């Protein structure tokens, strides 16, 4: 288990080298990243890469804020860490990122059915300590009811994240989002992954036109229809151009977070291609 000092240690000049222009908009569109894209790096190496990429607003992957628990770690061990870790661990990350010009606008903390009330509450405390106004969650549909009171109390919106595989109690279809939001407060929202949505054979633009007030973040990736593979931006069926153009035309300040998942040669090189592709659309 990492100590805060080890977890956050870095060369003295790292934050300065990562500094980027503090304007999060590009031609009126917020183009950021889900730091899961840089999952092959620790929290400090991730920050350095963001500086190289000139990305200044992120949705933070929980793996960049929590220890790298080995596969198979008992849930009770993870829960114990979450319930006992000082919040200063998260405020230190926030300061390091903010000092480098990077805003953490969302925190990825995936509430599941086996989360205790205390563990749910801590997720909102972590988000607040990071300065995040949004939590994104690869959650269960039924868990929304349990999360809602905590979201209302914290006044932090929770964007439920979809995948492409259509199974009971998981988010994939428009109806799954509707079921989760039905009867809930305005704090239960949508984190729309447009690549997964297309892979499940749904139209992201059509969905956005109807539900944009409840969409708090978007994940940008390219996939083929019919549960197709993740591919380089522009090689799949995902209407990335149409989504970003719609956001620009309608002046939607919804963070569009690049999530790099296809197989490339070098992470930073591939993410740079993704960034350039998105920026070229809205330029």
Language model region names:
Residues 82, 88-96, 146-153, 242-246:
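Catalytic-core regions built around general acid/base machinery
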Residues 11-12, 16-17, 23, 96, ...:
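Active-site acidic/histidine proton-transfer and metal-coordination neighborhood
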Residues 58-61, 104-107, 136-137, 256-258:
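Short beta-strand segments at enzyme active-site cores
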Residues 63, 112, 140, 163, ...:
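Flexible loop residues that form catalytic
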Residues 2-35, 39-57, 171, 178-192, ...:
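Histidine-acidic metal/acid-base catalytic patches
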Residues 61-91:
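Glycine-rich, proline-tolerant flexible connector loops at the mouths of alpha/beta enzymes
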Residues 37, 79-84, 108, 133, ...:
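The substrate-binding groove and active-site-proximal loops of carbohydrate-active enzymes
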Residues 37, 61-62, 108, 162:
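Residue-level recognition of beta-strand->loop/alpha-helix junctions
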């Amino acid at each position: 288990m990492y100590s805060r000092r080890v977890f956050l240690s870095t060369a003295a000049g790292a934050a300065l080298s990562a500094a980027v222009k503090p304007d999060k908009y590009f031609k009126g569109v917020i183009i950021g990243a889900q730091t899961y894209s840089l999952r092959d790096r620790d929290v400090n190496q991730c920050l350095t890469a963001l500086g190289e990429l000139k990305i200044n607003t992120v949705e933070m992957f929980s793996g960049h804020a929590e220890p790298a628990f080995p596969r198979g770690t008992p849930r009770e061990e993870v829960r114990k860490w979450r319930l006992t870790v000082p919040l200063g661990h998260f405020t230190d990350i926030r300061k390091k990122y903010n000092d480098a010009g990077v805003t953490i606008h969302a925190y990825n903390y995936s509430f599941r059915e086996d989360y205790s009330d205390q563990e749910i509450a801590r997720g909102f405390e972590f988000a607040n300590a990071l300065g995040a106004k949004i939590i994104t969650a690869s959650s269960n549909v039924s868990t929304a009811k349990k999360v809602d009171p905590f979201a209302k109390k914290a006044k932090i919106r929770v964007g439920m994240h979809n995948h492409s595989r259509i199974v009971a109690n998981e988010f994939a279809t428009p109806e799954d989002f509707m079921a989760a939001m039905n009867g809930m407060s305005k704090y239960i929202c949508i984190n729309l992954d447009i690549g997964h949505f297309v892979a499940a054979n749904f139209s992201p633009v059509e969905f956005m036109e109807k539900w944009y007030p409840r969409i708090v973040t978007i994940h940008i990736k390219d996939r083929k229809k019919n549960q197709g593979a993740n591919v380089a931006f522009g090689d799949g069926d995902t209407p990335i151009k149409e989504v970003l153009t719609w956001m620009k035309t309608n002046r939607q300040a919804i963070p569009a977070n690049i999530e790099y998942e296809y197989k490339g040669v070098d992470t930073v090189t591939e993410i740079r291609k993704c960034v350039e592709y998105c920026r070229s659309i809205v330029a």
